[in-house]
Amino acid sequence: MEPGGEPTGAKESSTLMESLAAVKAAFLAQAPSGSRSAEVQAAQSTEPAAEAGAPEGEGHRGGPPRALGSLGLCENQEARERPGGSPRGPVTSEKTGGQSGLESDVPPNAGPGAEGGGSWKGRPFPCGACGRSFKCSSDAAKHRSIHSGEKPYECSDCGKAFIHSSHVVRHQRAHSGERPYACAECGKAFGQSFNLLRHQRVHTGEKPYACADCGKAFGQRSDAAKHRRTHTGERLYACGECGKRFLHSSNVVRHRRTHHGENPYECRECGQAFSQSSNLLQHQRVHTGERPFACQDCGRAFSRSSFLREHRRIHTGEKPHQCGHCGRAFRALSGFFRHQRLHTGEKPFRCTECGRAFRLSFHLIQHRRVHGAE
């Protein structure tokens, strides 16, 4: 004991406690706010106070100790995926130069200043090809396979390869017929969750994809893309026989039947056959007399929606079909085509008796009376 002072042991203990408290405060100031691992590490830094007499080096080796819970969620997941479910072996600590039972907090590619809390925090694993960053090294490794083209996961049934193992699992449902995602409204089941989400919009009426030109909304992104072609005039699908192009692939399939003479849809009433099911439905209204499309202005009803659209233009005065030669406009497309023959000289209606051709069908009908045909 020093004269007139505290006992030497008590003074040394007090000084040590003050030093540890300062270390704790400094460490917490450097750690992210609310960090659980920082609080645990700081708490552990006070533990050597009870072992003040322990030789240097038997406690924590240089700097704040690693917290037991500091292994991140991604690393824990990686550990579970390794054989035996154990973390990687000891690695060299970048902070101390020695070995640690856990990986360093600073990733190998973090760059200068990473230990001081640089911009790597949160997503410390960047892709060298595109710069995108990831929270987990395993996610970064999976992403890099997109650039390398590597597809290590292969379907055992058909041999198709995939980038991610989860993609193989989804693909194999096509072979097994498994459909684990069922709609709670109607019970329809799907092999993939995103197909169920798309289907549910049928029940909810949700239409998140709106056309930027006219505002019309759609429940499916693909339907919105198809609709956009009506504004752009883009026709991606061409007929291999004649080169005629169409907005939709289904239109090409129907068109090809005109080349092959295929008419798979037959009327049960009269036996007339059609290349398209929609044409058969329209034809059947001739027998039933059904006219489901009524004009809201005058009440007149029509068997086809296209007839109603053309009729509505009588009330609105709309004439959307304009001649490029003389500028004359027409309500109906049929009138526009008839007018075009004035400029082109086309005469598609030919008499089978004498070979004379006409521009309009009713002119041919009138001419045939010359030959005595009704």
Swiss-Prot record:
SMART domains: ZnF_C2H2. GO terms for molecular function: DNA-binding transcription factor activity, RNA polymerase II-specific; RNA polymerase II transcription regulatory region sequence-specific DNA binding; zinc ion binding. Residues 32-46 have a biased composition (Polar residues). Keywords: DNA-binding, Metal-binding, Nucleus, Repeat, Transcription, Transcription regulation, Zinc, Zinc-finger. Gene3D superfamilies: Classic Zinc Finger. It comes from the Eukaryota. One of its GO terms (cellular component) is nucleus. GO terms for biological process: regulation of transcription by RNA polymerase II. PANTHER family: KRUEPPEL-LIKE TRANSCRIPTION FACTOR, ZINC FINGER PROTEIN 384. This is Zinc finger protein 696.
